[in-house]
Amino acid sequence: MSGIESTFFDIGTMDAISRQDTFVHRLDPRIKVLTALVFIVCVVSFGKHDISALLPFLVYPLFLVVVGDVPLAYLLRKVMLAAPFAILIGIFNPLLDREVLLYVGPLGISGGWISFFSILLRFMMTVGVALILVATTGYHAVCMALEKMGVPQVFVVQLLFLHRYLFVLVDEASRMVRARSLRSFQGKGLSMRVFGSMAGHLLLRTMDRAQRIHQAMLCRGFDGNLRPFHPLKVRAWEVLFLLGWSAFFLLMRFYNVPRFLGTLMQGFIS
C-alpha cells in the first residue's frame, strides 16, 4: 500500500508545490504554457546526432527550478519514472548505427550511441519542463490556460476529470491492497488469478465511486463549464518573459553556440 501511495502515485505533492508564491508561480498560466510549447518544439526539432546544440536549453529548466523553488530531487524522481520509455526507444540505436562519428581521445563513439544520448537528453528536458509547468502553475490553472487558448472545452474537461479521478483510483487501490495485506500471511499468495480478480473489482469500485462523485457535482450545479479561481490577465512584463525566452530558444535552435565557442577557444589556443 505504501508503495502505491508514496512511490508511484505521489501526485499530491505537485499541487502543494504549485501553491507557493514565487516569481514563476505569479506568471500568467498562458504565458508559461506558450513558453513551454516553444521550448519543447525547439528541442524536439533537433537532429538525432545533435547533443552539443541541446546543452544551452538546460538553462531554462534550471532557471525555473531555482527561481520557482521546485525540489530538484523530487523532479528527477518523477522524470526517472518515465525514463524507461525513452530507453526502450533508443536502446537498439548503438546496434543499428555503428559508424564512428566522434573520437574522445583514443575512444571512438558511434552514431548510435550519440543518437541514444540525444534521445535521453531531449526526453529529460521536455518531460522536466512539462513537470515544472504543472508544479509551478497547478493542474487546474494549466487546463484553464488551455481552454482560454482555444483548446476544445470537452478535451480540457476530460483532462481535469482524469486528474481528479486518478486520486479516486489511488484511494480505492490503497483500500484493496490494505484489506488484502490484513487477510494474507505477510502479503503472500498474490497469483495471477487473484491479481486479475483484484483488478476487476478495482475497476468496478472506481466506476461506482466516480459515478457518485459525478452525481454530487451535478447536484452542486456543475454544467461542464470551467470557472477560474481568479481572472486571468496578461501583463506587459509577462509578455517580455515569453518573448525573451522564445528569442533565446530560437537563437539556440538555429545557431550552435557551444560549437562556435569551442572553435573560438581553439583559435585562441592555437
What do the predicted segments below correspond to?
Residues 1-49, 56-66, 171-270:
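Transmembrane alpha-helix interface motif
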Residues 31, 52, 152-156:
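Membrane-interface starts of transmembrane alpha-helices
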Residues 33-34, 54-58, 76-79, 83, ...:
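Hydrophobic alpha-helical transmembrane segments
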Residues 59-69, 83-88:
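Alpha-helical transmembrane segments and their membrane-interface exit regions
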Residues 69-76:
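Membrane-interface helix-boundary motifs at transmembrane edges
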Residues 78-185:
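Juxtamembrane/interface alpha-helical elements of multi-pass membrane proteins
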